[in-house]
Structures are given as structure tokens and as C-alpha cells.
Amino acid sequence: MAKLDTAALNQLFTQARTRNGWSDQPIPEAVLRELYDLVKFGPTAANTTPARFVFVQSPEAKARLAALSSGSNGPKILQAPVTVIVGYDLDFPETLDKLFPNAPGAKNWFGDPVAKEVGALRNSSLQGGYFILAARALGLDVGPMSGFDNAGVDKEFFAGTNIKSNFIASIGYGTEEGLFPRNPRLDFEEAARII
């Protein structure tokens, strides 16, 4: 595998910013499908892929989601062309015969409710990270948020399922509006060690 060039690394990491303001340029459905088709190839434990994505795009759906958000997140949701709800499906073990066929009975690994919840949350979080990087790779800006009513979102958008919300993220073409100076990050010595 070859190292990405500096321009690609800048776009994915060092120059990318969390956006709070959005242009009114729409995101075509084909781009949303392309985005998912990249995300689905990111690795998860035993190929569990428990994340489920709801692309909130219509004015009516955005208003419903904004009403369940905290503080300044509502206006961001209303302004962005799309906000995705990244959820996790607690019924994910039922897909493992298809997704992990080299281990028949793999769904039994997640028979314990705690193991199922932990596995679903952990691996959907991985997929959420892949989502952010895939969106940036396609030229989209991203504004992830965790300030919202999880139970309310679950009732409003996942009723009748065993899916729970993890986090939300607005996507689109960002503006400089509300863009804060880049905050510091921890240095290697503060966050990592080699043993």
C-alpha cells in the first residue's frame, strides 16, 4: 500500500475542519450512495458492520431532527443540506451468516446483551469515523455532533426497530461562518507511548 500524498492527507486530516456553516449547494443522491459504498468497506470486528445511516435531507425531516438537538445544533441541522444519523443495529448478529460466512454460528458470539451492545456501539463508532473520512475524500465537509436527545431520535427515526442513535453529523459544502480557530491537539508524548 502506498503512502497518500500531502494534498490527500491535508484534505482528510490536517486542513479539514469541523464546519458549523453551510452553503445551499445540495448533495445529489448519487454522492450519498457513493459515500456509503466507501464506508461499507471499512473494517469492523468479524465484519459486523452494525452502523445504520439515515440521511436527513427533506425540510420536514430536518425540522424533526433539529427539534431534538441541543443548543446551537438545531440551526446547523436546518442549514446543512444533509445531516446523517449514525445509528447501531442491535440485531446485527442476524446478518453474520451473510457477512461472516467463514465462521458459521458467529451470531452466537453476541448472545449476551452486554456484548451485543458493546460490539454494536464500538463498531458503529468505527464506521462513523470512516464516514467522516469518506465524506472528506469525496470533497464534502463534515460537522459531527453529539448534542441531541438520543431517546427522542430513536423514537422519531428508528421506531419499530432495534436501532439506537450513536451520533449525528451534518455534511455538505462548508462556509467560513462560525468557523473557530483550530484548537490544539495533544502531542504524541501526551497521548501515546511505545512499550
Swiss-Prot record:
UniProt entry tagged with the keyword Flavoprotein: yes
UniProt keywords, alphabetically: Flavoprotein, FMN, NAD, NADP, Oxidoreductase
The keyword Flavoprotein appears for this protein: yes
Pfam families: Nitroreductase
CDD domains: RutE-like
GO molecular-function term, one example from the UniProt record: oxidoreductase activity
SUPFAM superfamilies found in the cross-reference section: FMN-dependent nitroreductase-like
Obligatory cofactor(s): FMN
Enzyme Commission number: 1.-.-.-
HAMAP family documented for this protein: Oxidoreductase_RutE_HadB (MF_01204)
Protein family membership: Belongs to the nitroreductase family. HadB/RutE subfamily.
Protein name in UniProt: Putative NADH dehydrogenase/NAD(P)H nitroreductase Caul_0018
Source organism (scientific name): Caulobacter sp. (strain K31)
Organism lineage: Bacteria, Pseudomonadati, Pseudomonadota, Alphaproteobacteria, Caulobacterales
